[in-house]
Amino acid sequence: IYAVFNEKTTIDANEVRYLAKTAQARGVDSAGIVFQTNNDLQIIKRDFGSLELIGKTKNFSNSKFIAGHSRLVTNDVKNNQPVVKEELIVIHNGIITNYLEIWESIGLKPETELDSELIPVLFDHFTKKGLSDDDVVNEIFNICEGVISAILIAPRSNKVHLISNNGSLYYGYKEDSFYVASESYPLTSMSLDGVTQVFGLFSYDYNFNFAEILVDDVITKKRNYLLPKFEFMSSRDKLLERPEHDLKRCKKCILPETMPYITFDEYGVCNYCNNYTLKNIPKPVSVLESLMEPYRRKGSRDCIVPFSGGRDSSYGLHLIVEELGMNPIAYTYDWGMVTDLGRRNISRMCSKLKVENIIVAADITKKRDNIRKNVTAWLKNPHLGMISLWTAGDKHFFRYCEDVKKETGISLNLW
């Protein structure tokens, strides 16, 4: 997400290009912008990156404001941001994982399969009940699971609402201009004043003075690497066998009786546990806590935690926040093999723990093509020792982790 607002003069095109370029770190498959042309609010959505979109939109620099988005396309070909609903314009980062249940609970039906559509609907729904803007946002956060970091433009009430339940949204000022970005680095690198992280709601007054909202959405690319839509087929489901297993397991490590060479003693403990020799002496947690002390920053982020959304990294993030009391930024490298479930877990964990999530996305088309080549090459002469070829594409993970540390000024990353 990026945005610039100025009521006195037109926006600086070079600043917009810079913000659009930094936004592309989250993906270049799809982009969208909203800006003012004469008396109308113009929304343009395309299936390429934000910098290219800005370059092909010649009249954006005549506007006094612009807000945009750049994203990775994983399972939907639609250029879905910004979202327009109830005369509200929303640009959203994150995933609302329980959006279908919420639609059912409020007795309304979605027009699209997009979870972000729910944000303006809920904002309008609770506003009509007479709630204040702060209470409306709190209600949205209370019923939604997953990350919500969004710009919500309410042109009829001349308001720009910044909302975030995990801190992945920042704003700053320079002279008469107001700037917004998903991360702090683009704003601090522009030497803005008062760069602030959003938790909850921050509202900015802006006089839009418009007639109508125009939407220009064009899809030109056919993407054959997206996740197929799940379709339940009862005829195929009947072919599946789901036998109930009653396996004997080790009382300590839960290894099953199907494990090669396993035996159990009279207490139900396996031979692997009985013969295990401790390789080192675990130190108490207090030692780890003392190692963290020099890195702690009261009230600000103090470490980077690489985060895939899997079981191990999710538990690790929980320990770092809840047990060690650190204030991390979760860093995710999406290289084409992060699953849809992984992305949803990332959204759930970061919202629950109120952890900012910085996402760096690869060129998915190229990455998946390389993965296919590596797997094909391995299959010609399969060997267990060479199976690491399958994950060769994720090694940029380490490089971008160092970039994130430099941009945030954080020297510690915890694995």
Where are these regions (language model features)?
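A broad, low-specificity signal for short, low-complexity segments enriched in glycine/proline
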Residues: 28-30, 167-170, 231-236, 373-376
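Short Cys/His-rich Zn2+-coordinating modules
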Residues: 227-238, 253-256
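ATP-dependent adenylation/nucleotidyltransferase module used to activate substrates
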Residues: 247-415
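Conserved short alpha-helical segments that host acidic/polar catalytic motifs at enzyme active sites
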Residues: 1-227
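Generic amphipathic alpha-helical segments used as scaffolds and interaction surfaces in large
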Residues: 7, 93, 128-131, 236-241, ...
